[in-house]
């Protein structure tokens, strides 16, 4: 019985791969044009109304700026219990770069500097 189930799943996978659209069908001239996507990419890169790093993004959490490679993330936290704003339990959010992305960016920059010079 197990062999029959495995054979059925395998044949279904093979059939679906054979009948799927090929890359030529998907990237044909009529279905995909690079001119359609370029304005969206340009708009994201030139976004001037973004929130700078370590600035408040509480009201608009998707407004953080980009660094050289990655977009900063709006990180939220509650202030310490000693401060007056903590008594109001107000959440504060700032645009920050996650540490792993910071290390990746620095490592790639050092590799690029090493390769070029």
From Swiss-Prot:
Superkingdom of source: Eukaryota
Propiece residues: 21-47, 82-87
Gene Ontology molecular function: toxin activity
Tissues where this protein is expressed: Expressed by the venom gland.
Comment field on protein domains: The presence of a 'disulfide through disulfide knot' structurally defines this protein as a knottin.
Oligomeric and partner information: Heterodimer of A and B chains; disulfide-linked. Interacts with CSTX-1 (AC P81694) (Kd=430 nM), and with CSTX-9 (AC P58604) (Kd=370 nM).
Identification of the protein by name: Neurotoxic enhancer CSTX-13
